[in-house]
Amino acid sequence: MKLLVPIDGSNASINAVKKALELARKYNYSIKLISVVAEKNSEYRRHENAWRGVDGSIISESVEIEKQLENKIKDNAERLLSAIVSKLNFSGIKVETEVLLGEPYAKILEAAKNDNYDMIVMSNRGFSKIKRFFVGSVTQRVISEAPCPVLVVNTTFEP
């Protein structure tokens, strides 16, 4: 059986990894850790205005700069996944990692469907009630559309 574990770097998502490890050891599951980088994340947006001329047009060099920034963001996500694998004890468990670029909930669902995962193990990050009401959380969207069971590890869970 295969577990899909989305990681965002928060302590809550690390606890979800720990829960997935517990299940993998007990039931001989494999684990795939994914980090989904939103295409227009906060680091990207910080630089976006610098790529525009006074008339709003995109400066020609900005395409190359944008690609470099995208690569930097993906490299950071890959380092995060590597650090998690090296810090936690995955001995005896088949583990894969992958960085995906796109809308987090959509990429999680796409990975779950395309690779036939048996379960998604993820955290429920703490959005404010107002923000959750208007935009919904990634976790809520994954739960409502997932092709497999979703185990939600509460932010207060401590393995």
What residue spans do the PLM features occupy?
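Short, conserved glycine- and acidic-residue-centered signature motifs
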Residues: 13, 74-77, 135-139
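Small/aliphatic-rich secondary-structure junction motif
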Residues: 1-63, 89-91
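Structural beta-alpha unit
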Residues: 71, 75-120, 157-159
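Conserved beta-strand positions in the Rossmann-like core of class I SAM-dependent methyltransferases
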Residues: 32, 96, 151
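Gly/Ser-rich helix-loop-strand patches that form or flank binding pockets
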Residues: 106-159
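Short, conserved clusters of charged catalytic residues that mark active-site
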Residues: 15-18, 103, 137
